[in-house]
């Protein structure tokens, strides 16, 4: 939602969720409910994974419009991001789409269980993307120790948006040095994992 409000030049947004209420509240006009229930995943990645598998046809339709590159952004550690992002990434890559994951790892105050679940999610999504950027939220707290909880989450959202915008606008905006999609594809294809932990 934050990324959509910030806007990225020439990028189309789709919000996916297992929670129909969260989808209805989203400002993003193109929405995809994963699974039929619409009740959320209850912090259970397995439930979200099943919901995404139920929605493969809808995922294919969403991606089958000439899409050449997809950014899959997700907060790791909860249910939907952790469980569904790897399924969406897998399908995008199967379709020959350059697939970039940008994910966050939770703050320490969110608890060790959530962090462990997030790390499992990062490992799983890394199997299905060409490149994966991992943003360590706790590092933001180390750099900005005076942040309150709300500001810390806002900073994490901003960092995720900046990462996506930076990569997307290399292609979509004209600058002094112009790179096209093939240039970026050459760099990112099967590029592995990068850790983004400094924030700004």
Language-model features, listed with the residues they occupy:
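Tubulin/FtsZ superfamily GTPase core signature
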Residues: 1-200
């Amino acid at each position: 939602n934050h990324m959509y409000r910030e806007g990225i030049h020439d990028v189309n947004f789709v919000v996916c969720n297992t929670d129909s209420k969260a989808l209805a509240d989203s400002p993003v006009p193109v929405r995809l409910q994963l699974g039929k229930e619409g009740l959320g995943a209850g912090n259970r990645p397995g439930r979200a994974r099943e919901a995404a598998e139920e929605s493969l046809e809808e995922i294919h339709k969403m991606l089958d419009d000439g899409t050449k590159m997809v950014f899959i952004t997700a907060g790791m550690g909860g249910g939907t991001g952790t469980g569904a992002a790897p399924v969406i990434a897998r399908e995008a890559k199967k379709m020959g789409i350059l697939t970039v994951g940008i994910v966050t790892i939770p703050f320490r105050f969110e608890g060790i269980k959530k962090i462990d679940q997030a790390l499992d999610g990062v490992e799983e999504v890394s199997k299905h993307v060409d490149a994966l950027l991992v943003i360590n939220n706790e590092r933001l707290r180390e750099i900005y120790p005076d942040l309150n909880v709300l500001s810390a989450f806002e900073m994490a959202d901003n960092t995720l948006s900046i990462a996506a915008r930076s990569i997307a606008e290399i292609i979509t905006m004209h600058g002094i040095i112009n790179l096209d999609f093939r240039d970026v594809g050459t760099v990112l294809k099967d590029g592995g994992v990068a850790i983004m932990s400094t924030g700004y």
